[in-house]
Amino acid sequence: MKCSLRVWFLSMAFLLVFIMSLLFTYSHHSMATLPYLDSGTLGGTHRVKLVPGYTGQQRLVKEGLSGKSCTCSRCMGDAGTSEWFDSHFDSNISPVWTRDNMNLTPDVQRWWMMLQPQFKSHNTNEVLEKLFQIVPGENPYRFRDPQQCRRCAVVGNSGNLRGSGYGQEVDSHNFIMRMNQAPTVGFEKDVGSRTTHHFMYPESAKNLPANVSFVLVPFKALDLMWIASALSTGQIRFTYAPVKSFLRVDKEKVQIYNPAFFKYIHDRWTEHHGRYPSTGMLVLFFALHVCDEVNVYGFGADSRGNWHHYWENNRYAGEFRKTGVHDADFEAHIIDILAKASKIEVYRGN
């Protein structure tokens, strides 16, 4: 009797081990074949599949995108198309200065404060705290939807836009980024009529329509104090030059260019050629970090080799290139490499 009972227990034990082995094999096979899951609980209606990632992680990839980061024909977020680009590009650094990245590292702080040194020093964080009570301190580009194609036009101010006929094409983009003076009235056929982002300094600032984001490019703490003043009390009227005491822009659409991002371009992309990157480069790399597809208009000389603005008739207006502040030739070289890497499309104009 005792022997029979012992045999029965051993048989049951072997059976249990066999069943557990089958379950483990089935489970392992199921994961290896990457089953599809309903992503309704993830806020969408698309089916997704589990993709092996790092230990303890599972990444969700939407079916049908073949791993692409957007639905454009070319996507900025797709790695592997250019080793040079991938080694320079850092998606973790935000082009917008916000409450979350308010604290600058000492090396960035020193570099930024030397761009336009001031006699009186200011506590940058205290200035930002006050500013973010007036304008948003959030990053509007935090989330990227791989099911969208955000097309962006970066419109420079080159005279090569005159007679180009690019206007309608420029206006077809989701984001249209312009800089400094950049008039559109009277030039719509060549430069377009729409603007979504306008990048300016205090010394170049102008009033904007309510549907346009004013992106302030600050060179000093006084620039931050100026925008807070220009949207409230109007006390600041002078930086190193006269500035508008009041500015008519949509407060909810004001964004502040991140000095850390500014230095990142200087260090990694323009590689310290010139004292600091030009406004055109600042806007171009802003677009490269918030857009899926980037098309560039109005950069470089015209077909006769003249460097002037499209609203000017003075072909000698490009004398700024000789100041040494920016290295226009090296920046043009970087733009050419980006185009060859299929990261941007450059429209050369007239």
Swiss-Prot record:
Lumenal topological segments: 28-350
Amino-acid positions noted as binding substrate in the UniProt annotation, renumbered to this chain: Q116, N157, N180, Y240, Y276, G280, G300, H309, H326
Membrane topology: Single-pass type II membrane protein
Catalysis performed (reactions): a beta-D-galactosyl-(1->3)-N-acetyl-alpha-D-galactosaminyl derivative + CMP-N-acetyl-beta-neuraminate = an N-acetyl-alpha-neuraminyl-(2->3)-beta-D-galactosyl-(1->3)-N-acetyl-alpha-D-galactosaminyl derivative + CMP + H(+); a ganglioside GM1 (d18:1(4E)) + CMP-N-acetyl-beta-neuraminate = a ganglioside GD1a (d18:1(4E)) + CMP + H(+); ganglioside GM1 (d18:1(4E)/18:0) + CMP-N-acetyl-beta-neuraminate = ganglioside GD1a (18:1(4E)/18:0) + CMP + H(+); a ganglioside GA1 + CMP-N-acetyl-beta-neuraminate = a ganglioside GM1b + CMP + H(+)
Disulfide bonds: C70-C75, C72-C149, C152-C291
GO molecular function: beta-D-galactosyl-(1->3)-N-acetyl-beta-D-galactosaminide alpha-2,3- sialyltransferase; beta-galactoside (CMP) alpha-2,3-sialyltransferase activity; protein homodimerization activity; sialyltransferase activity
Protein name: CMP-N-acetylneuraminate-beta-galactosamide-alpha-2,3-sialyltransferase 2
Biological source species: Rattus norvegicus (Rat)
Lineage: Eukaryota, Metazoa, Chordata, Craniata, Vertebrata
